[in-house]
């Protein structure tokens, strides 16, 4: 027992894979904070910079007993673990000087402010790259740093639906599309930013210094959810898949069904899953028909 405990303790005390990497996070809500949390989870030293009003997630909740409190927001806590913090008003000369001092120290800056706002603060990549030539800047916005929508303010829902993903995944055929249930575009943008940002950090010696990693949350969703199904088909044949509703056509039966104590998600894709479902249903005779013996014929006859 003592040997096992010692081994676990030894693993816990080892530095993370990103130990020694210094990160400044200057973001709000989800995309930049979660991206920075991925760095901190792997051992990077992350300093979160908040404007005097604080991260908007502090006011978003959820809160214990539904009582709003700036220090008790669940959304803020989940995306900001393992970080140090400082308040800094970058709109003032003293605040900007402090922020620039942090940039000179850092390997990475992660931010999700509007491009025009960063330019107004003189903190856009063109303005700060000379401060620290090895600095990697990860800018995560709904629509990217360039293009027709780059100057537009937007939120997770705007980025998600602009990608076209909701035309396939949100709601049932013939009905109004639905909102997705979480900050999907922001989280996918954050993961994309962390992945390419870490590559940029470790590639600095190859490219001769730092660089800007420009992440569009809408494009991250389009690449993950829309690309394989729709972009190629539309480009080649003018065809795109419509909404299929809940479930997977190839995985029939795959859907949400009412049951005695609520609802159940059912997916019987593999042979073992199908046989288990048959058993739960009492092995009805119709389940022995040839058309139901593999997932392809089940899908064709669903």
Question: Predicted regions span which residues?
Answer:
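Residue-level marker for the onset of beta-strands and adjacent loop->beta junctions
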Residues: 12, 75, 211, 252-253
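Short Pro/Gly-enriched beta-strand edge/turn motifs at strand-loop
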Residues: 58-63, 234-241
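Conserved Rossmann-fold dehydrogenase catalytic segment
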Residues: 174-183, 205-221, 243-249, 290-294
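Aromatic-enriched alpha-helical interface/lid elements that frame and gate functional surfaces
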Residues: 252-302
């Amino acid at each position: 027992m003592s040997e096992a405990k010692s081994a676990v303790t030894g693993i816990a005390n080892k530095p993370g894979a990103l130990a020694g990497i210094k990160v400044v996070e200057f973001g709000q809500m989800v995309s930049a904070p979660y991206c920075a949390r991925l760095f901190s989870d792997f051992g990077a030293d992350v300093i979160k910079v908040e404007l005097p009003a604080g991260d908007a997630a502090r006011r978003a909740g959820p809160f214990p007993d539904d009582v709003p409190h700036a220090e008790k927001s669940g959304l803020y806590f989940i995306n900001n673990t393992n970080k140090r913090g400082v308040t800094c008003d970058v709109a003032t000369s003293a605040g900007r000087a402090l922020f620039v001092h942090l940039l000179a120290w850092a390997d990475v800056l992660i931010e999700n402010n509007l491009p025009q706002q960063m330019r107004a603060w003189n903190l856009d990549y063109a303005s700060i790259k000379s401060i620290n030539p090895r600095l990697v800047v990860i800018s995560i916005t709904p629509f990217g740093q360039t293009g027709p929508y780059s100057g537009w303010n937007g939120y997770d829902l705007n980025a998600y639906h602009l990608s076209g993903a909701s035309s396939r995944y949100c709601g049932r055929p013939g009905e109004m599309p639905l909102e997705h249930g979480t900050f999907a575009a922001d989280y996918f943008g954050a993961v994309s930013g962390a992945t390419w940002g870490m590559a940029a950090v470790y590639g600095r010696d190859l490219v001769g210094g730092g660089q800007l990693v420009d992440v569009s949350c809408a494009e991250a969703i389009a690449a993950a959810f829309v690309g394989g199904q729709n972009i190629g088909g539309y480009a080649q044949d003018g065809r795109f898949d419509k909404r299929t509703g809940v479930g997977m056509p190839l995985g029939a039966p795959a859907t949400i069904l009412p049951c005695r104590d609520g609802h159940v998600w059912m997916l019987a894709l593999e042979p073992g899953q199908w046989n288990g479902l048959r058993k739960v249903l009492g092995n009805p005779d119709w389940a022995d028909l040839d058309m139901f013996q593999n997932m392809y014929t089940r899908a064709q006859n669903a």
